[in-house]
Amino acid sequence: YKQDAMNEWGSIVALTYMAAQRSFPDYNDMADNKAYLESIARSFGYFFGTEKKVRVNTISQSPTPTTAGSGVKGFDGFIAYAEKMSPLGNATAQDCADYTVSLFSDLTRRVTMQNLFHDGGFSNVGVSNAVMEKFMEE
């Protein structure tokens, strides 16, 4: 940040995952690092905001097949579970790219220091009918 590389009203966006706030099996170190990333975004959001009016946000994306994610034991289960829990279904990588572009636009000029969930509603659902059906006796 000391290099003065950002233009005024610029935007910085990082990708994270809700495991930064919740427990997910076998996501241990990655979850710790995502929590740290979200904290850095808040800290730098304040610094860059006051110095250059630069916005700093994180996007908490649906579980998405990536090189990093493929190394997490049971990751396919995360994807299937989130799909069953999300009213709108999982957001794809392309959906995330489109959403990210909006954070670089002037339409989000006053959005900063936020962790924005982009997960089809998964982060706010306690339990879905699709998941409950798995536990119901027939």
Labelled PLM ranges:
Residues K2-T50, Q61-P65, G89, F122:
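Catalytic loop of short-chain dehydrogenase/reductase
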Residues Y1, G45, G49, K73, ...:
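Generic helix-packing signal
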Residues E51, Q61-S86, D95, G126-E138:
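A glycine/serine/threonine-rich, flexible loop-to-helix segment
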Residues S11, T67, S105-T108:
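Short linear Ser/Thr-Pro motifs
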Residues T108-V111, N115-E138:
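C-terminal tail/cap regions
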Residues W9, K53-R55, V111-M113:
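Short, small/polar-rich loop/turn modules that mediate ligand/substrate recognition or access, typified
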Residues T58, D76-V111, L116-G120:
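C-terminal helical subdomain
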Residues M18, D26-Y27, S70-V72, N115-L116, ...:
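Short amphipathic alpha-helical segments
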